[in-house]
Amino acid sequence: MPTNFAEILNNCVESINSFLWGPYFLITLLCGTGLFFTIKLGFVQIFKFKMGLKELFGNFSLHGEAAGKAGMSQFQAVATAIAAQVGTGNLVGATTALIMGGPGAIFWMWCAAFLGMATNFAEICLAQIYRTKDDSGHTIGGPAFYISRGLKGKLAKILAGFFAIAIIIALGFIGNMVQANSISDGFKGAFGIPQWITGAFLAIVCAVIFIGGVKAIARVAEKIVPIMALLYVGVGLTIIFLNFQQIPEAVSLIFRAAFDPSAAWGGATGASIAAAMRYGIARGLFSNEAGMGSTPHAHAAANVKHPVDQAVLGIMSVFVDTFIVLNITVFVVLTANVISFENGKAVFTGITLVQEAFSSHIFGKVGGYSFVAICLFFFAFTTILGWYYFAEINVRYLLGAKAVRAFQILVVVFVFLGSLQKVDFVWSLADMFNGLMVVPNLIAIIILSPIVAKLLKDHDAGKEYDVKDYLK
């Protein structure tokens, strides 16, 4: 029997998560929606992949369309989206999935990400179509806007409001506590810096950037994201290459454990196929955010000639997040052979497991721990900025620009507090609110799917874009 309020609350959250992330609800809904859009849009994630690469690398070198006074450039938008996607989910989330769901969880991450590319494409198309300007003249958009403006009626406004509240709590407050805690833990382990000092530094830097608004966030994202991704991927590939003999076994283990979890580490994890699916898809969502309705907020602000030009970058952002950055973490850990168990429990978990893996070659103990802590800082810090921006848009949707300053103060406080607290329970809360965000978003994009299909068909036919052709 639960003996205190905290235990009762924890049990309630776990019960909700068991339903949301069990084998029958969100996993089916997310994968089903991804499959639906994959078929309806003609495997858009495959046939528009080349276009996505061209847009991504063309914008990387040329910085794409000009930002304009009210929005972002195409490159700034995708950089902000990737900044939000590439965070602790790519390090801590990946290792949590490995330990709790076994290596088979990675297979389900891949499946969910492949299908999620089509879902993300649809989200971004709708975010571009239904975007608007707020009372300060900013170009804003996202699920709350395409739910309320696309579906219409009282129920649509209720669903939009529910989504807006869920994302403010999930990303603005709870999610950013998780990111801040990961940074403070990493710096304490690597450099011995007290958590309150890291928390205070984070809070001050975030406050300065928040005050600068969307332009400041976009400028930081477009400068940091390419550097941090290339650095992490480059070092990770070096370690994987040094352990190249282990690659075939690592790949084999992922596929075997997806359908027979006992194939991994003598069954020490105790994971089931259901657990592999749950942790793979849930942690995958926390990482790539496809279907969650978060990254469309960044893409909605992009200044592009046609929504499809931006939507293909949504395909690429999921690809970069899961199939490149997250896979680097997975294969560094698996090929370094640092996973071990004592009495049924993993010896190393979370960020420590990643640090041990990076310590196995090149750096040594001190260098490995320090390198991962620095990478984690940039990953998690840019995620805080991206998630703050997504949540702020929904504050503007619900309460208007007048409420933004109070929201900024609250987020800064939560960032500081998150640096100090143990966040095992907060991870569970994040799973719950992420799940609650998914439901209204997926309902809306499925109902509005004919608009996405028409938009893609018109684009492929070379028809000039006019938003009035798609507004219901």
Please give the residue ranges for each predicted region.
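N-terminal alpha-helical transmembrane segments of multi-pass membrane transport
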Residues: 1-88, 98-105, 116, 416-417, ...
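Transmembrane helix-loop junctions in multi-pass membrane proteins
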Residues: 8-9, 41-45, 90-94, 171-183, ...
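Membrane-interface loop-to-helix entry segments
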Residues: 29-33, 40-53, 163, 180-187, ...
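Helix-loop-helix module between adjacent transmembrane segments
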Residues: 33-38, 112-137, 144, 148-181, ...
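Flexible loop linkers connecting adjacent transmembrane helices
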Residues: 44-72, 96, 102-105, 110, ...
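Alpha-helical membrane segments and immediately flanking helix-loop junctions
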Residues: 62-100, 126-129, 135-144, 148-150, ...
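Selective recognition of specific alpha-helical transmembrane segments in multi-pass small-molecule
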Residues: 115-123, 200-214, 225-245, 278, ...
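Extracellular/periplasmic helix-exit of transmembrane alpha-helices
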Residues: 121-131, 135, 237-253, 261, ...
